[in-house]
Regions:
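Anaerobic metallocofactor- and corrinoid-dependent redox/one-carbon enzyme cores
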Residues: 1-367
Length: 367
């Protein structure tokens, strides 16, 4: 049964003192829980989240992270995206790393390729400090952040307060494949799911007096609710990574974008392939069938980016910097934002596995 993956409340503090941040985050957390309770009358909700805007110049990311995390946790919200910076404003890489390590989510916007080395050092520095912290941080390639409920790059890009939704629905598609042709079932299921989501979201907005920004129609996995499994079904049960994978992802993405055009859509509205969050994709990466370069290729046909990929010691500064440049090239090719969430495990090599908190055992990918 489809369910809401995330109720994300976006809030924009009028000032950035510690007390102001705590007050705004507390209000947003309370509202997020109220929205979730209203929606649960019709459809299950997995998580509630709060997202802040990019930090103004001169604001200390550590102070913001501390205040935001404390206020969110006190109000039952585990997911708080609080530290978003343009890479040009990152004067001290260590401060950003320290802030993310406090438990918040965050991102750095990379609008130009000449900042690739600093961006690579951020990824490597966070991974060296804490592998789980690296799962809470992403680079965003583009001229600005997208407005999406998906973490870690959920950023308030508007004034005031509003909310957006993301959904799980891949299992609904898989369960219905025997009833319809493949492409038809995706349209039928997605239209049904997002019709319901829009209905409950508008009801919550009206009942609670908070703006509904829209839904991100992206097709995303969580472990056995596997997008990679759907891709393989559409390939006639060939393994992901085989010839034909790119074409299937492109077709699937085309359908999702068409669905997004018929709803109040925000965010990416694309196929998402976060390796550590998809049990079938983990298997293919562990087998060496899907490598980092394959994921990079798939992102050219509108996968949201290279996401939740664990790499080993063979990916040092030069290699990560090269991948950053490649992701920037994908952004320029596509013309809209893409993300990179990379976890570098020291002392590990491709084919190894690491334990990564709630994501379980995750394979180290081949470049």
């Amino acid at each position: 049964m489809a369910r809401v993956r995330a109720v994300t409340v976006f809030v924009s503090p009028r000032e950035w003192s510690r007390e102001s941040i705590k007050r705004y985050v507390e209000e947003a957390a309370v509202r997020a829980n109220e929205i979730a309770e209203h929606i649960r009358e019709r459809i299950d909700v997995w998580t509630v989240r709060v997202a802040l805007p990019p930090l103004p110049e001169g604001v200390d990311p550590i102070a913001v992270a501390s205040a935001a995390f404390e206020a969110a946790e006190a109000n039952g919200v585990r997911y708080i995206a609080a530290v978003h910076l343009n890479i040009g404003g990152v004067g001290d890489v260590k401060k950003v790393i320290d802030a993310i390590e406090m438990g918040v989510y965050g991102s750095v916007l990379v609008p130009r390729s000449d900042q690739a080395e600093k961006a690579a050092r951020l990824i490597l520095g966070i991974s060296e400090r804490d592998l789980l912290a690296a799962t809470r941080f992403a680079l965003v390639f583009g001229s600005s952040w997208p407005l999406t409920p998906y973490f870690p790059i959920a950023v308030q890009t508007r004034s005031g307060m509003g909310f957006g939704l993301a959904a799980f629905y891949v299992d609904d598609i898989l369960a219905s494949l025997s009833e319809y042709e493949e492409l038809d079932v995706i349209r039928v299921v997605a239209n049904r799911v997002f019709g319901l989501i829009e209905e409950v979201a508008r009801s919550a907005s009206q009942a609670l007096g908070i703006d509904y920004y829209g839904a991100d129609a992206s097709l995303s996995p969580w472990m056995n609710e596997s997008v990679a499994r759907l891709i393989e079904r559409m390939m006639g049960d060939a393994k992901m990574g085989s010839p034909g994978t790119l074409a299937v992802i492109r077709e699937l993405n085309r359908i999702i974008r068409a669905i997004a055009s018929s709803i109040d859509a925000i965010g990416f509205n694309e196929v998402m392939l976060p390796v550590a969050e998809d049990s079938v994709l983990k298997e293919r990466v562990g087998e060496g069938r899907v490598r980092v370069r394959d994921l990079l290729l798939y992102s050219t046909v509108c996968v949201a980016g290279v996401d939740m990929v664990v790499v080993g010691e063979d990916m040092g500064l030069r290699e990560v910097q090269g991948l950053v440049r490649d992701m920037y090239a994908v952004y320029k090719l596509k013309g809209f934002e893409v993300g990179l969430r990379l976890i570098r495990a020291s002392g590990r090599k491709p084919g190894d596995e690491i334990q990564l908190g709630m994501f379980g055992r995750v394979p180290v990918a081949w470049p």
